[in-house]
């Protein structure tokens, strides 16, 4: 397995043959199933130096051969010793119980693993591990551990992991114009998007092909790119849409609004824009005209008629917005100041009287408390926090977001530390409390049927190491993690009952040793051994008969009895 190669990498680089010779001798002398993988690696890598006479004289070496079932290893061993096949056979006959004792250990340990729900869960994830490097825990380097024990206090965790982002102040009007233009172009595609949509506009426009831009899109294109005759679609696709020198100032962003605008600009540069950006601007901007315009963009309804909707009745709001979109988005209604009141009368006339209440006020939907905004100005935040605001929720709520400041512990630098922390708890505790999106959550409260949630919680590298170590405890080597690992464990138990694998492989590769093998099996004259090799002897009955005919050391009854055992009709 790969983790064994990395374990011995420093000695491999130094070509430390003495180390590997001693390492193999130690692992053979103190053999256990957990040594199978390491022994196999050392033999494959340094067989010319490490396969000494002492190794071939040790019973445990042949127990290893019985468990490994690896053709490449068999070839190496067979080339290293001309009589290893007979040595294996003799060791099996003399120390049969030693072989069976380790088989019993395999069965016990495999049954324990198959009863372990945690192990079964990780094996289901194994297809995701194929190209992953497995690593062990390094809790001494993880800030979420103290004296190799996980810290459980979230405030302490926050203090250790939080890193404030340095936002650069941007030119407010330039960013707002760019935001409106990009959002309007996105709406021109005619597609529907979630308020927190994170798809980049480049990909969307590549799929749609050229789109016809609305008047608003082209108007704001003129604001952002004066004297540029290219249509918004081709301008966005082919030209650079941002200019850091004009947008960024030399000052740090101080207020929450300045920080959010800086983040929005960085996202627009990556072609990402959504409705939540408009909502946040509406909440934080103090200009009434900008707030009004953002509201129109959010709902896609002229501002003059928005005042009839009130946030206190979600059913009404939903009814009216759908009603207006279905009946009056026709390029005729509310397009002329002279006809405005006539159009408004027609709209009102079609509204269900039970739904109508002129006192309704949509602006209070996103109205924010100045005190709350000031608290945000004073709060240290990072890009993770603003990202949560823009992408992790359908409805932007500053009060709710204030309580989610702990989510800021997530960033590229802390992601692995959190995953290592969660993985450690999962592998060592039942239903632990883990860190999920900046909050402490009971593991049982999360949907672990979702791979995206599982791998946002846990480290693939650590889970793979856990799986590798459990399989190594059985002496199992997995080359393809997409295979059915549970099936391999179960079939491994039955395969170990077949003691002829190495003998069959050796005789297939070298027919000249067949006579010697047959002779050795018969001469031991042990019923149990003859039964173990019954199929092998049946397949090579010619050599059996030849030997029995020529030997003078067996009586007529001995020969008859041996043939009866081979043919399965003895009493």
UniProtKB/Swiss-Prot annotation:
Major subcellular location class: virion
Biological function: Late protein which may play a role in the virion morphogenesis and have therefore an indirect role on viral transcription ability.
UniProt keyword list: Late protein, Virion
Family: Belongs to the chordopoxvirinae E6 family.
InterPro entries linked to this entry: Pox_E6 (IPR006749)
GO cellular component terms, A-Z: virion component
Species for this entry: Fowlpox virus (strain NVSL)
Protein's name according to its UniProt entry: Protein E6 homolog
Subcellular location: Virion
Induction, as annotated: Expressed in the late phase of the viral replicative cycle.
């Amino acid at each position: 397995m790969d983790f064994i190669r990395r374990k011995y990498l420093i000695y491999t680089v130094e070509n430390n043959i003495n180390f590997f010779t001693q390492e193999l001798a130690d692992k053979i002398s103190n053999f256990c199933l957990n040594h199978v993988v390491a022994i196999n690696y050392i033999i494959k890598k340094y067989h010319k130096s490490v396969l000494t006479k002492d190794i071939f004289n040790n019973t445990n070496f042949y127990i290893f051969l019985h468990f490994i079932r690896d053709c490449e290893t068999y070839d190496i061993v067979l080339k290293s010793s001309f009589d290893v096949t007979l040595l294996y056979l003799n060791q099996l006959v003399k120390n049969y119980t030693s072989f069976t004792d380790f088989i019993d250990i395999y069965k016990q340990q495999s049954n324990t693993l198959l009863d372990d729900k945690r192990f079964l869960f990780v094996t289901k994830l194994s297809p995701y591990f194929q190209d992953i490097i497995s690593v062990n825990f390094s809790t001494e380097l993880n800030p979420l551990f103290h004296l190799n024990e996980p810290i459980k206090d979230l405030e302490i965790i926050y203090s250790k992991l939080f890193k404030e982002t340095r936002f650069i102040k941007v030119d407010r009007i330039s960013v707002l114009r760019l935001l409106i233009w990009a959002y309007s172009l996105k709406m021109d595609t005619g597609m529907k998007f979630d308020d927190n949509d994170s798809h980049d506009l480049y990909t969307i426009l590549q799929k749609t092909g050229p789109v016809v831009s609305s008047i608003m899109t082209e108007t704001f294109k003129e604001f952002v790119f004066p004297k540029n005759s290219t249509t918004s679609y081709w301008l966005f696709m082919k030209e650079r849409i941002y200019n850091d020198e004009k947008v960024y100032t030399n000052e740090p962003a101080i207020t929450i609004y300045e920080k959010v605008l800086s983040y929005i600009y960085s996202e627009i540069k990556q072609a990402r824009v959504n409705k939540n950006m408009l909502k946040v601007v509406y909440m934080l901007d103090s200009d009434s005209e900008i707030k009004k315009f953002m509201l129109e963009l959010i709902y896609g309804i002229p501002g003059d008629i928005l005042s009839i909707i009130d946030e206190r009745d979600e059913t009404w709001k939903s009814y009216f917005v759908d009603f207006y979109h279905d009946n009056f988005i026709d390029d005729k209604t509310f397009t002329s100041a002279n006809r405005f009141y006539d159009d408004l009368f027609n709209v009102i006339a079609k509204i269900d009287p039970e739904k109508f209440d002129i006192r309704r006020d949509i602006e209070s939907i996103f109205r924010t408390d100045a005190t709350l905004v000031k608290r945000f100005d004073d709060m240290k935040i990072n890009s993770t926090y603003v990202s949560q605001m823009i992408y992790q929720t359908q409805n932007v709520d500053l009060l709710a977001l204030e309580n989610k400041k702990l989510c800021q512990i997530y960033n590229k630098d802390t992601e692995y530390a959190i995953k290592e922390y969660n993985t450690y708890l999962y592998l060592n505790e039942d239903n632990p409390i883990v860190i999920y999106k900046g909050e402490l959550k009971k593991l049982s409260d999360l949907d672990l049927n979702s791979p995206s949630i599982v791998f946002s919680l846990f480290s693939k590298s650590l889970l793979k190491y856990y799986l590798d170590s459990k399989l190594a405890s059985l002496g199992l080597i997995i080359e393809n993690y997409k295979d059915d690992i549970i099936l391999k464990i179960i079939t491994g138990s039955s395969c170990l009952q077949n003691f002829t694998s190495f003998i069959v492989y050796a005789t297939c590769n070298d027919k000249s040793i067949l006579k010697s093998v047959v002779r050795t099996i018969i001469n031991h004259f042990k019923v149990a051994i003859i039964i173990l090799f019954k199929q092998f002897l049946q397949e090579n009955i010619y050599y059996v008969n030849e030997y029995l005919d020529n030997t003078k050391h067996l009586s007529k009854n001995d020969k008859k009895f041996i043939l009866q055992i081979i043919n399965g009709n003895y009493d």
